[in-house]
Amino acid sequence: AAIAAPASLVVVAAIRPPLGLWPSVTAMTADFHTGTGERLQIAPLPQLKIELDTQSSLRRRSDAQGEGFELVQGQAAIETGAGLRLALFAGPGCVIADEGAVRLDVRNTHGQVRVTCLQGSARIEHPQGRLQLQAGQQTQYDERLSGVVAEAVASEVSAWTEGMLVFRRAPLREVVDEINRYRRGKVLLGESALARAPVSGRFRIDDPDAALEQLRLTMSLDLRRFPGGIAVLG
């Protein structure tokens, strides 16, 4: 006889899918959603263009001064026209763009939010304070607002909008995590010691398996493949 899974386990699997093998209920019920390997361009308001990257979810969310949006998860490239006030919630903070034409790249993954201002200016409102960003600046926050602002390389930050991933001495763990966002199944690192190995390169997001093969060759790694899209690199 078949054994039914406890209801509590089913609920947990729906909210937090094991190995991230399928979207969560929260992501699937958002107003706009992309699956693995998909991208979506939308214009939900006049003078507002948004491009969602793979595994991204966006929903409408009102704020005190009007309509806004929430980046539930994933990454979005945003372009606003002059005269539009945009409130984009991401994690515990909110990105406000209300000072003319603005281009932003906002990423919300693994509990960490990264905001890059590519054109114009924007400010972050967070329970721990406010932070202003100008064109070419980037910051990150989670439950803490560090206030650290760094210079951003626009061509690298927005490379995904042109179908590429660009890394410059990024830890292998970070590269694998990014490949997993574009690939069905799951890539695992076989040795924890490899996690910090630096990686530099350009990879096409529409062929993540070619990226794995490139890593295997350039770093002299083993690559084992298993059913269900599971692969072990190490």
Give the predicted meaning of each segment.
Residues 1-71, 77-234:
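A residue-level detector for the "anchor" residue at the start of short, highly conserved motifs
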